[in-house]
Amino acid sequence: MSRVICLGEVLIDQIAEDIGVSYEQVSSWKPFFGGAPANVACGLAKLGTPVSLISCVGQDDAGTNLLRQLGALGVETSGVQVHPESITREVYVTRDANGDRSFDRFNGDEQTIFADTLMSAKDLPEHLFADAKFLVLGTLGLSSPQTSRAIGRALKLADQYFVKVIVDVNWRSMFWTNPEQMIKLLPVLLKHTDFLKMTEDEAKLLFRLTSPAAIAQAYNHLEGIVITNGDQDCRYYLGEKQGKHATFPVYSTDTTGAGDAFLAAFIHKIYDHPLTNLLDSKFVNQAIAYACAAGALSTLDVGAISGQPSDRQIREFLAMREAKH
């Protein structure tokens, strides 16, 4: 059976229980499972798509708990390395009155070395790539030399085993000691990328463009580009056609992981079909609508994982929307 591989950070999101206050004013924090690649993996598992995670955690309570939760959620974890000396990363997240989040700082005071920055290239499980259909990764791992080398080997394995590469930009300046470095490294990553997902702000920052078709023209090897814009819309260039889909309005509690839920749902919809289906406008529109619904539903609960919807919840939500129109 083929699978999806998600590669990258798994960590703890410490989310402020106080709304609309600064980091210094927060009175209490609540820990949640996090890390974009891990969020996508959990979203896929919940939707029923076979998925493995390749990552690195510390040999600490946080790392042990994350591994336990991954297994309980149905994510295959043979590719998760355990570093004996470095700690598992925690990110402190504040929220405004609309549920939109800000990433403030990490655990360990001024520490910059965490387990997820020390992924070993030689310890990547090659057998996972032999039966994989997609490799999903972000860009945060490129900020550390060792994990960047692991990403490089993963891309070579993906090429060797004809695995399609999906990149979610997931720009977070706080992960980089030199943010300009990421802009220099992105073109190298794009050479190995088949499908690219990013937010409108990321598209402006990295490409100075917001049109998926215009970006596809500049990088014509890309098979698909999706640009999300929060609660506004989603624009895409798939199957050599461009399109746009409005998001679904909901009363959001927490937007952490909404983009990850979107991506997991999109991959789930195309996983069981030949990629030639992306030439079918109806199929593409249904896949994007499904992904938009997943992203919206995920914001109804706090934390990136707890709000991730099931296939049934997404289908019922879409059916209800259809009935109203």
Could you say what each language-model-derived stretch is?
Residues 56-58, 78-87, 223-227:
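Beta-strand->loop->alpha-helix junctions that form or flank phosphate-binding loops
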Residues 3-5, 156, 208-325:
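Conserved phosphate-binding/catalytic region of the ribokinase-like
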Residues 1-76, 325:
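Glycine-rich phosphate/adenosyl-contacting loop at the front of the ribokinase-like
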Residues 68-86, 94:
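A glycine-rich helix N-cap at a beta->alpha junction
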Residues 127-128, 188-189, 218:
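Structural alpha-helical scaffold elements that stabilize or flank donor/cofactor-binding regions
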